[in-house]
Design a protein with these regions (language model features):
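Transmembrane helical core of 7TM receptor-like proteins
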Residues: 1-316
Length: 316
């Protein structure tokens, strides 16, 4: 009886999943791991440095830097949800992950991505208020408001992603447990099921368009309003500085969203997209923003750049 019960449970939910890595490129896994590992180290060092500087310097406890602090924490969690396991696959052939471990990774990947998307929207709003309503900046964005915004960003990510776990747990897998990927994501797991995954597809599409899609629209609207304000500045030098800063921000935002939407829509409509391209892009959208954000939002900011140079001179 016990054996039969275990057999039925395994047929419905496999006890483990096998993560293949990048199919067709297993021989190159070691070489592929080098740039990914290098970027991961850069992300850890860059975001860790930003956090250290902002936390230890009380003069930087202002709205813009507090948002940057939130972004750095999110970046550290985002890349750490997938990179350690991916490197374990590439270096140690550690392809196995438990069923619940896979669901946990899936939950954090999507929840942290949604949280970072909300934080990028909050940072765009911060820049809008700073440039378009500078006299009301400190009254609109005080520490209490920023704390509530941060909590709302996290709560929204958790709230919208939690149903993914329920939608996956209702699916039977009929013994299928091999994922052609380096990490667990919602549609990758759902496609292994031996029943209809229409509810998963519909809910995933709804979340992507209504949550992440709305973030993109509102971020774009914020930067359009910022652009209008910048064009009205009397000094050409001030205009160029504002264009340079906003242009860098927009580039990082595009790097964050374009590969993410490519990965999302490839699962649903990209039957002819090579799996290697899909998997590499699916990893890059979780790794490249954590590498770039400290450079664009942090080191590109004069106050933080000065603190970093001061740290370097003190050590030398």
């Amino acid at each position: 009886m016990l054996t039969e019960s275990m057999s039925n449970d395994t047929a419905f939910h496999p006890s483990t999943f096998i993560l293949l890595g990048i199919p067709g490129m297993q021989d190159q896994h070691i070489w592929i791991s080098i740039p990914f590992c290098s970027m991961y180290i850069l992300a850890l060092v860059g975001n860790g440095t930003i956090l250290f500087i902002i936390i230890t310097d009380k003069t930087l406890h202002e709205p813009m830097y507090l948002f940057l602090c939130l972004l750095s924490v999110t970046d550290l969690v985002l890349c750490s949800t997938t990179l350690p396991k991916m490197l374990a696959i590439f270096w140690l052939d550690a392809h196995t992950i438990s069923f619940h471990g896979c669901l946990t990774q899936m939950f954090f990947v999507h929840a942290v991505f949604a949280t970072e998307s909300a934080i990028l929207l909050a940072m765009a709003f911060d820049r809008y208020v700073a440039i378009c309503r500078p006299l009301h900046y400190t009254s609109i964005l005080n520490a209490s408001v920023i704390g509530r915004i941060g909590a709302a960003c996290v709560a929204r990510g958790l709230l919208f992603v939690f149903p993914f776990i329920i939608l996956i747990k209702r699916l039977p897998f009929c013994g299928r447990h091999v994922l052609a990927h380096t990490y667990c994501e919602h549609m990758g797991i759902a496609k292994l099921a031996c029943t209809s995954i229409k509810p998963n597809t519909i809910y995933g599409l709804t979340v992507a368009l209504s949550v992440t899609g709305m973030d993109v629209v509102l971020i774009a609207a914020s930067y359009v309003l910022i652009l209008r304000a910048v064009l009205s500045l009397p000094s050409q030098d001030a205009q160029l500085r504002a264009f340079s800063t906003c242009g860098a921000h927009v580039c990082v935002i595009l790097v964050f969203y374009i590969p993410a939407f490519f990965s999302f829509f490839t699962h649903r409509f990209g039957r002819h997209v090579p799996p290697q391209a899909h998997i590499i892009l699916a990893n890059l959208y979780l790794l490249v923003p954590p590498v770039l954000n400290p450079l664009v939002y942090g080191i590109n900011t004069k106050q933080i750049r000065t603190r970093i140079l001061g740290l370097g001179l003190r050590r030398s």
